[in-house]
Amino acid sequence: TLAGLALTASGLSSITSCTEEKKRRLVFYFTGTGNCLYVARKFAENPLSIPQIIRQDKLEFEADEIGIVYPIYGHLAPQMVQEFIRKARLKAPYLFSILTYGNRKCSATELWNNLATENGTRFDYITTLKMVDNFLPSFDMNEQVKIDKQEDKQIAEIMQDIQARKHWIQPVTEEEQQQHAEFMQRAGHTLSPSAEKLLVIKENCIGCGICVKVCPRRNYTL
């Protein structure tokens, strides 16, 4: 048709059929340093920040697809993400979660699936995504950035799974379960809510205030 020729001439060679409905996807994220925001933006144009959303009185959401992206903290979801999944009511034909980590994931997918199920949310797809580890007390960032963890390749594979609405919960091995049990015995006390108040300020602090601006829990003042 003339309309089709005009579109082709203008460079718009592919158009979406008027009868084809675009799926509405909501993606919620929690990020401390930006890793999970980067991932969330790959799956939704305007992802929703859990620290901002959780202040709402009503946490009921409905869409064609709903996803949650968060960093694994000590094999667990951050406290605020745990609070969100306990309070929120997520209604969608397809629910997915992407858990990012830098070193070991251990029982993270299993623990998250159990927590969500106990609180009335059943995820169809839960996977992990290995990225740069930015837990500064344990890792040297200069060394971490040298490691090619192929984040974008992993994201592309996850994206294919979600587009196909794959039903899959990443399995946890017995070795990973044992690693988690040993970790909790050794350092479980540092994962309590009180650990959020632990802060070390050294003489090299320049008072820029970035920590105050980016902290999702508003733990810091300057």
Locate predicted features:
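C-terminal segment of N-terminal export signals and the immediately downstream linker at the start
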Residues: 12-30, 39, 45
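N-terminal export signals
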Residues: 1-17
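Active-site rim beta-loop-alpha module in soluble metabolic enzymes
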Residues: 172-186
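Glycine-rich phosphate/pyrophosphate-binding loop and the adjoining helix
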Residues: 136-176
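Ferredoxin-like iron-sulfur electron-transfer modules
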Residues: 184-222
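Helix-loop-strand module that forms the ligand-binding subsite of alpha/beta enzymes
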Residues: 51-133
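Generic secondary-structure signature for well-ordered alpha-helical cores
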Residues: 121, 160-168, 210-216
